[in-house]
Amino acid sequence: MENRKVFLNKHTNLLELEEHMYPLVDVDTPNVFRNLFHYDEIPKIAFNDRIVPHNMPDEIWITDTTFRDGQQSRAPYTTEQIVSIYEYLHRLGGPKGKVRQSEFFLYSKKDRDAVYRCLEKGYEFPEITSWIRASKKDFELVKEIGLKETGILVSCSDYHIFYKMKMTRREVMNLYLSVIRECLETGISPRCHLEDITRSDIYGFVIPFCVELMKLMDEYKIPIKIRACDTMGYGVNFPGAVIPRSVPGIIYGLTTHAGVPSELIEWHGHNDFYKAVNNSTTAWLYGASGVNCSLFGIGERTG
């Protein structure tokens, strides 16, 4: 502890010790938190009574995923429907952009036509962004259309890393960083979607990965956003709940231990256990400026 620097926290106006650094923990076997998520039992909510402080950002807003997540549970929207809904989003968000951004698929001609039609409107808000996998081939679509920001799927739980990606933590981190670096090389701002964060090893993978992202941001002077995705709807807002299920704990880890500014953090929740609204407002209270939503209550599985 004596080697850690003392600094003035400009947010609290208190002298604080420099945070402990968390290196990547590269494991041979996946940590799937079977003690919390047993296949034959209801998922458990465990507590350790570690309370983290509120950290309300100076400004909060909404981002939209109607044309991405919102289409994954229903028949795809037509181009005309997308343009009409985008118009609604513009009106709902108002001139100050409370609905800050909207994300689009780029894979089909219909998707790309919708993007071009919405771009033609010239609205400042919601800004049009895209969603891609961590693939350099996918990134070519973003460059072709000329968007300024894209979401990138970066699955972060060992369920996804080992069983879907069939890689180790270090291998998948290197893959993600290579795609993100290519984004930065072309001047495009990456938004990293931390898929399945509520089943991930927060301090063994998520925080070390986000620390590397913040280093890239310092190097390229281009914002890198972090979207915390509660893919299974397992997040809880109860004080003292353990990570990875604790929404306050996740946001605290991102802001305090990874050094991600509030304005670069979004929460993306699901409503499987009817906690999407509670968890979203909790994310705001604990330091995430953005909450990712879908119109009409429509989203993958439960909205």
Task: Label the predicted regions.
Residues 1-303:
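Catalytic cores and adjacent flexible loops of soluble metabolic enzymes
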